[in-house]
């Protein structure tokens, strides 16, 4: 029986664990709280993944080590390198294949559709931290691949849309959004991202490069309108937050202050090309309405 380790306990980690377990493969999930889904083939362990010796012990014998874990948003520049170094060391010691969940911050502002072959040219601290994690893993000689997702949406998502947009839309309230309302963005569903992680882990030609999770590309206004129509809520009222709004909110909550780097790129659509994922890994995007219906 194949054995995999997943570092993380969020929606993507849990869905990935269930996909593997439902195929009869054993999974050990590692997180500080020991969370994860209830399944006979899923073992949940409370441990700190930055404790490299403990992580190595828990990953011994694993065919694959998946990571979906990230530090608190405002602490990425300081803590993500520590976590990434621990994960990479554990992979080196155990010989497990390494599958990373990433995002698009490492690309920086890009014009036109982004392929996974684009250089990682971000200059901001969070973007550089993300890029460095992949660059160091790719240069290490281990068997590694990365799946980069857009902004998450749908059931289980933790994102700007899920935190700030979906509930006010469903309740018919004014929606304050810290990004441009009519600029296209690529959104990834949790299930599609998990399916891509599993598919990449099983495909030999997936290693040594990055892939894009399937996405739906539309503006936040369009996505909010679709959700309202499906749920029977009123036409959404959206208002774009200014940089000054974010600065003031950041005084009391560091999360808001951190959004400047990744959300205020005027006129820059964030559009991911995932055609290679469809063609080679065989994973496509779930229709937008099907993803949104999970929220109703």
Listing of model-derived features with the role each one plays in the protein:
Residues 13-14:
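N-terminal Rossmann-fold NAD(P) dinucleotide-binding loop
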Residues 35-94, 201:
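NAD(P)H-binding glycine-rich loop region in Rossmannoid oxidoreductase-like domains
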Residues 85-130, 145:
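Conserved Rossmann-fold NAD(P)-dependent oxidoreductase catalytic core, especially the SDR/UDP-sugar
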Residues 103, 135-156:
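Conserved beta-loop-beta element that borders a ligand/cofactor-binding pocket
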Residues 131, 154-165, 200-211, 233:
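Glycine/proline-rich active-site loop of Rossmann-fold NAD(P)-dependent oxidoreductases
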Residues 167-188, 204-205:
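A conserved pocket-lining segment of Rossmann-fold NAD(P)-dependent short-chain dehydrogenase/reductase
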Residues 216, 220, 224-271:
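Terminal hydrophobic/aromatic helix or amphipathic segment near a protein terminus
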Residues 276-278, 282-296:
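Amphipathic terminal alpha-helices
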């Amino acid at each position: 029986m194949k054995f995999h380790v997943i570092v993380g306990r969020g929606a993507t980690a849990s869905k990935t664990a269930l996909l593997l377990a439902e195929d009869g493969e054993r999974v050990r999930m590692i997180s500080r709280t020991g969370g994860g889904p209830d399944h006979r083939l899923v073992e949940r362990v409370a441990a700190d993944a930055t404790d490299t010796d403990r992580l190595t012990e828990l990953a011994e014998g694993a065919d694959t080590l998946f990571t979906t874990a990230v530090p608190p948003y405002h602490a990425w520049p300081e803590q993500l390198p520590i976590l990434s170094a621990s994960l990479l060391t554990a992979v080196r010691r155990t010989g497990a294949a390494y599958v990373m969940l990433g995002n698009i911050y490492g690309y920086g502002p890009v014009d036109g559709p982004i392929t996974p072959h684009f250089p990682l040219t971000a200059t901001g601290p969070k973007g550089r931290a993300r890029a460095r994690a992949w660059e160091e893993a790719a240069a290490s000689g281990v068997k590694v691949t990365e799946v980069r997702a857009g902004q998450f949406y749908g059931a289980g998502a933790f994102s700007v849309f899920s935190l700030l947009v979906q509930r006010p839309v469903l309740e018919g309230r004014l929606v304050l959004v810290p990004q441009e309302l009519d600029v296209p963005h690529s959104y990834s569903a949790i299930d599609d991202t998990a399916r891509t992680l599993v598919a990449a882990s099983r495909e030999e030609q997936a290693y040594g490069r990055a892939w894009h999770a399937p996405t739906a590309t539309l503006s936040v206004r369009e996505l909010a309108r679709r959700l309202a129509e499906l749920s029977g809520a009123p036409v959404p009222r959206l208002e774009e937050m200014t940089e000054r709004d974010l600065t003031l909110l950041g005084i009391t909550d560091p999360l808001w202050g951190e959004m400047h780097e990744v959300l205020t790129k005027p006129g820059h659509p964030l559009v991911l090309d995932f055609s290679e994922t469809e063609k080679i890994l065989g994973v496509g995007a779930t229709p937008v309405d099907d993803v949104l219906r999970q929220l109703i």
